[in-house]
């Protein structure tokens, strides 16, 4: 089981929107050096929605190649068509991903039975560890604990990224799932308490810019060291908030550019961080000691 701080990696782009391959390789090395426990490539923060299928697979391939077995790579392969999710998952497996993260189908708002059949179909079609991803604030679809419990019985479905921010869900899901089923927070603001309450880690936006602190916070929280975990988290609280001052990944890409790690590149309909928001993010970075 992967535990700890799992970065939801931003996808570096050149100012004209093309993929920045050297920048991507540089970010992977940065996370390995900083102690990040695993990388999610082309999730929400990786702008999966604006990458075409070839680019999607290429980013995963490049991250796997650069990681070279030193850190697990989880590929974002969710889609709102089951056939597409199967195809993306198969392609991720073919280029060496260790696991896949599949967001619930978005926009078309499936029923709970539809969600069950969707994930079952992917698990039956592609033999790779599969992590469910529930983020109703983006998808318009909330996967309920009972559905997670059903899916946890399916071979190959190994965990969930639960991004509602509802801490009570941790106990509800844990009670319905077999031992060893991984529960990851998808909400940086509540991740510390999530891990202190028995969660296995966080798939994090904040970890893009403060990877060492996020890893240390997760390690302490999973070990039950509340004092240490909360002390570290206090340094991160402003980042947890201000990296969402505009839609993710707008602020985090600006922050990474401010750190000199990536170029000033993002794809429409996302735009570069508004000037009026920059000082708040800059101050949050200073509070965390990353600027």
Curated annotation (Swiss-Prot):
Positions bearing the site annotation: Part of a proton relay during catalysis: 44, 107
UniProt keywords, alphabetically: Amino-acid biosynthesis, Cytoplasm, Diaminopimelate biosynthesis, Lyase, Lysine biosynthesis, Schiff base
EC number(s) from the headed UniProt entry: 4.3.3.7
Residues that, per the record, bind pyruvate: 45, 203
Record pathway: Amino-acid biosynthesis; L-lysine biosynthesis via DAP pathway; (S)-tetrahydrodipicolinate from L-aspartate: step 3/4
Gene Ontology terms for molecular function: 4-hydroxy-tetrahydrodipicolinate synthase activity
GO BP field: diaminopimelate biosynthetic process; lysine biosynthetic process via diaminopimelate
Keyword Methyltransferase (UniProt): no
Pfam family for this entry, one: DHDPS
Superkingdom of the organism of origin: Bacteria
Segment forming the signal sequence: none
Main location: cytoplasm
Catalytic residues of the enzyme: 133, 161
Family indicated by similarity: Belongs to the DapA family.
Known function: Catalyzes the condensation of (S)-aspartate-beta-semialdehyde [(S)-ASA] and pyruvate to 4-hydroxy-tetrahydrodipicolinate (HTPA).
PANTHER family: 4-HYDROXY-2-OXOGLUTARATE ALDOLASE, MITOCHONDRIAL (PTHR12128:SF66), DIHYDRODIPICOLINATE SYNTHASE (PTHR12128)
Subunit comment: Homotetramer; dimer of dimers.
Protein name per UniProt: 4-hydroxy-tetrahydrodipicolinate synthase
Native source species: Methylococcus capsulatus (strain ATCC 33009 / NCIMB 11132 / Bath)
Gene designation: dapA
């Amino acid at each position: 089981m992967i535990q700890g701080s799992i970065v939801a990696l931003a996808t570096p782009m050149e100012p004209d929107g093309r993929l920045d391959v050297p920048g991507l390789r540089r970010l992977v090395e940065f996370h390995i050096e900083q102690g990040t426990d695993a990388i999610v490539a082309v999730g929400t923060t990786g702008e999966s929605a604006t990458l075409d299928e070839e680019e999607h697979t290429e980013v995963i391939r490049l991250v796997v190649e650069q990681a070279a077995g030193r850190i697990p790579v989880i590929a974002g392969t969710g889609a709102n068509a089951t056939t597409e999710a199967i195809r993306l998952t198969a392609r991720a497996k073919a280029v060496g991903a260790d696991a896949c993260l599949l967001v619930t189908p978005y926009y078309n708002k499936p029923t709970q039975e539809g969600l069950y059949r969707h994930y079952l179909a992917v698990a039956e079609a592609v033999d790779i560890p599969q992590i469910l991803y529930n983020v109703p604030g983006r998808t318009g679809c909330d996967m309920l604990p009972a559905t997670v419990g059903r899916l946890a019985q399916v071979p190959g479905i190994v965990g969930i990224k639960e991004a509602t921010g509802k801490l009570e869900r941790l106990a509800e899901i844990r009670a319905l799932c077999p031992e060893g089923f991984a529960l990851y927070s998808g909400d940086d603001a509540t991740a510390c308490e999530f891990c202190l309450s028995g969660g296995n880690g966080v798939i994090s936006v904040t970890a893009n810019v403060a990877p060492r602190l996020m890893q240390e916070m997760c390690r302490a929280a999973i070990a039950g060291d509340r004092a240490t975990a909360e002390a570290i988290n206090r340094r991160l609280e402003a980042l947890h908030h201000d990296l969402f001052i505009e839609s993710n990944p707008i602020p985090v890409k600006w922050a990474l550019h401010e750190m000199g790690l990536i170029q000033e590149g993002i794809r429409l309909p996302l735009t570069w961080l508004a000037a009026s928001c920059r000082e708040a993010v800059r101050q949050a970075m200073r509070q965390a000691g990353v600027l």
